[in-house]
């Protein structure tokens, strides 16, 4: 066992040869490297698989013995200061290693096909491997200095991948937004690290916690200063994990390739903030009010993320706000002291959200065969619908991910979210009400995304690709579907109802292609050439993705089905997660053995499932396929006859829609007051620098120039000039003498 831990230092460096070799290959042998580019995906998967096997071995040993291993190398700069570098293997590290490697491998396999026709294929895999290296280094760090170094490397990789298609102005702007927003949090993190070093004199976690606890117990610290330093540390996690108010970068980060969205949202960048707070829990729990502040930020993010997801039309942005809300649940659990529940939800959410993002990538991939490469169209749920027949495997996997996130048993997120909801009641009734209400909102917006994407008819056939309407009946329902007031006499309602029964080509058959224009592709392929933005070749119907993309989705289905059983709290003997985290930090249940009886569990589960079911019912009520509503005209007429009540209902609905679709006006507020204010300040500083600061030396130079010109004209060699200036000076001196002696 000791030997296994001794070689754990190699874990972060195993994926590193891939970006280094790709860079050397492009520099020395560019043609050969590009022609053999597909082999780099195999090497990336192979190296990360080795890390996964190593991590599983460490995790098994952690479960059996709860052994904490730390190794440190000391670099002595002088007698008073030294830097220590090392690695720390404990239950938290082993959990994160498993998460990063398993999700990372699935994303890499998926990306091999998804990015196969992209000119940036090599660059993508170089970034991804370096991303894995940075995240693995972060979770194995033994001190705050290493944490900060790898923290910045994780951020750099995220910015590179968010702005991967940097020739698109929207992607470049999203990259810049993520960078600027995270700069705020990272600066706070750096100040917090320096503050605690000034207090304790150490960066090492073990020494830092021990010294700080002694100072707190002896009342030898300034609590105001300590609280400020703790908030600054937490600011880094706020930005990285997209917590309010530094959450604005996360939806725009969807401009990157879909595989990287899956990795960022499941196991890397946003998980880094949760990991940091979990790692520093022994520090935070002894500081008054800081845990309350963490839970407050968490509950605000929970509710805000859920409300902003209600009316999004972009499928990836809807999932992004879902991630924001679920991260809020994790932060809420950490703030309440439910260490185990937070990490449990981090695990279950990672696999469910990776499944949803890879499923959305499959949907986007299929929609690109209809509308060409244009994210505003291929990711727009307005143009989707009716994909159940064409993408059955993707549909079933997306449904499982949706139900898991809704909290439906026995799927993964049910077990973890239920613990957080129960703990929220013990912590604060107000927080409990908000958390339980948000669980219903989660079920609503996730079911909405599923219904708009897979149920009903393929709405791209109801309007052209430029967005111009050619029929008034392309709207499924409110929120996400525009209605049309233009009447079309040639359109028959009976025709619309019969469209459901018309046969459509199956994705299993490639013998026939149904053209919708003359630019149909000559060869059916499961991927597009991303760099060809002008490509207008389309098919009439989407089809299922290639097996290389479906394989990771199927594996993630297994994780979504069974990973929740790791933390079932019925019996201590089968509760693997509690053994893994023993001794865990749980302020709400300090004397608990993390096991509950059947009656208590059934009561709480019934309540949570009822709320989730209510949200699902409302979503089905509002977003069921359009033809089912048309077939029940009497049901529709009841809403028409509502009169004034309907007007009031529409006002409420539109207000909620505007709030959600406009991102709670938070981005607009930042743009108008912060961004505009900073730009005005920058313009004023520019004006002051150029017109005042620069004007002083420039004015002296001009005065010297004109003075020299005058002197030069005097000494021009003409006697008349000499006489003129001579008599002028004599006259001036005489006048001065006269006035002073009068």
Curated annotation (Swiss-Prot):
Keywords: Chloroplast, Membrane, NAD, NADP, Plastid, Plastoquinone, Quinone, Thylakoid, Translocase, Transmembrane, Transmembrane helix, Transport. NDH shuttles electrons from NAD(P)H:plastoquinone, via FMN and iron-sulfur (Fe-S) centers, to quinones in the photosynthetic chain and possibly in a chloroplast respiratory chain. The immediate electron acceptor for the enzyme in this species is believed to be plastoquinone. Couples the redox reaction to proton translocation, and thus conserves the redox energy in a proton gradient. The lineage of its organism: Eukaryota, Viridiplantae, Streptophyta, Embryophyta, Tracheophyta. Its EC number is 7.1.1.-. One of its GO terms (molecular function) is quinone binding. Belongs to the complex I subunit 5 family. Its main location: plastid. This is NAD(P)H-quinone oxidoreductase subunit 5, chloroplastic. GO terms for cellular component: chloroplast thylakoid membrane. GO terms for biological process: ATP synthesis coupled electron transport. NCBIfam families: NDH_I_L, PRK06590.1. It is a multi-pass membrane protein. The chain crosses the membrane at residues 9-29, 40-60, 89-109, 125-145, 147-167, 185-205, 219-239, 258-278, 283-303, 327-347, 354-374, 396-416, 425-445, 550-570, 606-626, 722-742. InterPro entries: NADH_UbQ_OxRdtase_chlpt_su5_C, NADHpl_OxRdtase_5_subgr, ND/Mrp_TM, NU5C-like, Proton_antipo_N. It comes from the Eukaryota. It catalyses: a plastoquinone + NADH + (n+1) H(+)(in) = a plastoquinol + NAD(+) + n H(+)(out); a plastoquinone + NADPH + (n+1) H(+)(in) = a plastoquinol + NADP(+) + n H(+)(out). It is found in: Plastid, Chloroplast thylakoid membrane. PANTHER family: NADH-UBIQUINONE OXIDOREDUCTASE CHAIN 5. NDH is composed of at least 16 different subunits, 5 of which are encoded in the nucleus. It holds the Pfam family Proton_antipo_M.
């Amino acid at each position: 066992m000791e030997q296994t831990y001794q070689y754990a230092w190699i874990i972060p460096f195993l994926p590193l040869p891939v970006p280094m070799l790709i860079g050397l290959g492009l520099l020395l042998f560019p043609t050969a490297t590009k022609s053999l580019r597909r082999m780099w995906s195999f090497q990336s998967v192979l190296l990360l698989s080795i890390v996964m096997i190593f991590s599983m071995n460490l995790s098994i040993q952690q479960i059996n013995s709860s052994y904490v291993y730390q190794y440190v190398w000391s670099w002595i700069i002088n007698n008073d200061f030294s830097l220590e570098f090392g690695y720390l293997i404990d239950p938290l590290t082993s959990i994160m290693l498993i998460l990063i490697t398993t999700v990372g491998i699935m994303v890499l396999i998926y990306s091999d096909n998804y990015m196969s026709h992209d000119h940036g294929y090599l660059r993508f895999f170089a970034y991804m491997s370096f991303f894995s290296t940075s995240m693995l280094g972060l979770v194995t760090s033994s001190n705050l200095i290493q944490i900060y170094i790898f923290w910045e490397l994780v951020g750099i990789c995220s910015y590179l991948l968010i702005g991967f298609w940097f020739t698109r102005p929207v992607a470049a702007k999203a990259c810049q937004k993520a960078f600027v927003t995270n700069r705020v949090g990272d600066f706070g993190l750096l100040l917090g690290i320096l503050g605690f070093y000034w207090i304790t004199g150490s960066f090492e976690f073990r020494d830092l916690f021990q010294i700080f606890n002694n100072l707190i117990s002896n009342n030898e610290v300034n609590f105001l200063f300590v609280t400020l330093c703790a908030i600054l540390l937490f600011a880094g996690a706020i930005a990285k994990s997209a917590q309010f108010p530094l959450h604005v970068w996360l939806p725009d980060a969807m401009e990157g390739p879909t595989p990287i969205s899956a990795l960022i949202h499941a196991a890397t960048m946003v998980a880094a903030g949760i990991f940091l707070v979990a790692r520093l829990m022994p520090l935070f729990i002894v500081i008054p009010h800081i845990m309350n502040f963490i839970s407050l930020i968490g509950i605000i993010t929970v509710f805000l993320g859920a409300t902003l997801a209600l009316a999004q039309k972009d499928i990836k942005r809807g999932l992004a706000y879902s991630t924001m809300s679920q991260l809020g649940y994790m932060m809420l659990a950490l703030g309440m002291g439910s260490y185990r529940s937070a990490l449990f939800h981090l695990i279950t959410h990672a696999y469910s959200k990776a499944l949803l993002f890879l499923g959305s990538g499959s949907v986007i991939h299929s929609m690109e065969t209809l509308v060409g490469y244009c994210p505003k169209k291929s990711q727009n749920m307005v143009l989707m619908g009716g994909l159940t027949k064409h993408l059955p495997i993707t549909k079933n996997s997306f449904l499982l991910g949706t139900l898991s996130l809704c909290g439906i048993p026995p799927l993964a997120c049910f077990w973890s979210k239920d613990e957080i909801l129960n703990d929220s009641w013990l912590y604060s009734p107000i927080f409990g009400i908000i958390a339980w209400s948000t669980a219903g909102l989660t079920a609503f917006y996730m079911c909405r995304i599923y219904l708009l994407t897979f149920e009903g008819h393929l709405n791209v056939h109801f309007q052209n690709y430029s967005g111009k309407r050619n029929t008034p009946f392309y709207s499924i329902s409110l929120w996400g579907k525009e209605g049309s007031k233009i009447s079309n006499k040639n359109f028959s309602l009976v025709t619309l109802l019969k469209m459901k029964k018309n046969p459509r080509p199956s994705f299993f058959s490639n013998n026939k292609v149904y053209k919708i224009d003359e630019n149909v592709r000559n060869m059916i392929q499961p991927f597009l050439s991303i760099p060809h933005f002008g490509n207008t070749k389309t098919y009439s119907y989407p089809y299922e993705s290639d097996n290389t993309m479906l394989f990771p989705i199927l594996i993630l289905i297994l994780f979504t089905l069974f990973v929740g059983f790791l933390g079932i709290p019925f019996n201590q003997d089968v509760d693997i997660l509690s053994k893994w985290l023993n001794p865990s930090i749980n302020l709400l249940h300090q004397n608990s053995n993390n096991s509950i009886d059947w009656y208590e569990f059934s009561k709480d589960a019934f309540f949570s499932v009822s709320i989730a079911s209510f949200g699902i019912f409302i979503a089905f009520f509002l977003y069921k396929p359009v033809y089912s509503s048309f077939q029940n005209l009497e049901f529709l007429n009841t809403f028409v006859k509502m009169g004034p009540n309907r007007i009031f209902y529409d006002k409420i609905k539109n207000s909620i829609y505007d709030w959600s679709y406009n991102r709670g006006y938070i981005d607009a507020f930042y743009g108008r007051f912060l961004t505009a204010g900073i730009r005005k300040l920058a313009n004023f500083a520019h004006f002051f620098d150029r017109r005042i600061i620069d004007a002083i030396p420039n004015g002296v130079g001009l005065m010297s120039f004109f003075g020299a010109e005058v002197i030069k004209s005097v000494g021009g060699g003409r006697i008349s000039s000499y006489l003129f200036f001579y008599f002028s000076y004599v006259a001036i001196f005489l006048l001065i003498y006269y006035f002073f002696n009068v």
